[in-house]
Every structure is written in structure tokens, then in C-alpha cells.
């Protein structure tokens, strides 16, 4: 899994509503390439078993934007609790070859072409902190600090290949 919820939130969880969303920092390609354009990411969801219709329901219908709708919108679930600083989402934490292969088998077939799957372009995007999909997003390198998962902090040497 590429989403890691904040352990302290899980340990002390006291869900007051039917559903919860962990708002997570998103990183791309490496552990410390921060994607500020898609942060906070609506990552890990939580609910009680009695409220779980399906995993797809949690992913597709339990959204933070639901809280902005009028209470007259009965079609939108509004019993949602937001947990800020809810963890980390590590997206495309793969070697360039694996990213290329992933894009070639991606459900969005429009990304299965050389414009996106070329190894040199992927490496260039990683080295220049650019978005794979040419959406104009520029990412930023951040230092591994106390805001990261404790395991990563304690094992930086083991993960040096994944830190720039």
C-alpha cells in the first residue's frame, strides 16, 4: 500500500461520525519529493463495519467536498469527520522502468504512449521534480524531518535510494 495513516491517530481514534478521511501529504517518485498540488490527499478512509457498504463506496462517495453541499442534498453522505495531518501518500514510488510499465498497463489508456512511458522522459521528470502527466505541476524536494513516518526517519540509510 502507498498510503500510511498517522499511527498516533489510529491508536487514539475516536470516530464521532459514520466515516472518517485521513488528509495526507502526497509525495511522488521518492520519499521526499512533495506534491503540494495534490496535498492534502484524501487518503485512508475509516468507518465501522456496520457502515461499510463496499470499498468502492468508501473511495468514490466518501469525499471531503460532500461537507460543502447543502443539507438538502440527500444524495451526498455528510457524516464525515476529517483528520488533518492524517499521514502520507507515496505515489509512483517506483524505479523509472516500473513507472513506465505501470503506465503501459494503466486503466487510462491515453497515458500508454511514448509521451509518458519513455524512460528518459520519466527520468527527466523525476530529476526536474515535474509531473508525469504534464499538468504543469512542479514538485518540491523536502528534507526528511520529524514530520515523516518514524520508521523512515530511523532507517534513512536503508532507503537512501528513495531519497534525493
Where are the regions that the model predicts?
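Conserved catalytic core of nucleotide-sugar-dependent glycosyltransferases
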Residues: 5-115
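Conserved "landmark" site that anchors the functional core of diverse proteins
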Residues: 2
